Amino acid sequence: GQPGDLPNFDEVARIAENAVIVTTGDQFHHGIGYGTHPEEALDAEPDGLRAAGSSIEVGIRLIEAGDYWGYNQHCVIAKSDDRDVAQLFRYLRGPLEGTLLDIGYSDATELYGQPPPTWAAGGFMKFEKVV
């Protein structure tokens, strides 16, 4: 919730001044391998991706609002690994408007040796500076 306090912030801010910022992350981890109770676990298609998309949209709105603490809490619930970078991006660029363009997922059942469903979803998003 304090992006300006992240390690190496000054260096990142200097580099980002005249740069396009591109990041990767999975904003939604779901399923048995991520601690979801089996009776609540959704297959990625079609219901899981709808849930992931809704969750990612909530995250976008929190970043737009500059609600760093709220976004932090949202990332805990969504099991997002995008916590620091999204907040840092907003902090560096100021007011932004975000759009979820597409969403994809990776099946992680073999990776974690867990039963299905175990998967992670990431959104293809763009953020534009509000002028």
Model-derived features with residue positions:
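Flexible, D/E/H-enriched segments
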Residues: 1-18, 31-131
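Hydrophobic "anchor" residues on beta-strands that sit immediately upstream
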Residues: 20-22
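Catalytic metal-binding/acid-base residues of hydrolase active sites
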Residues: 24-28
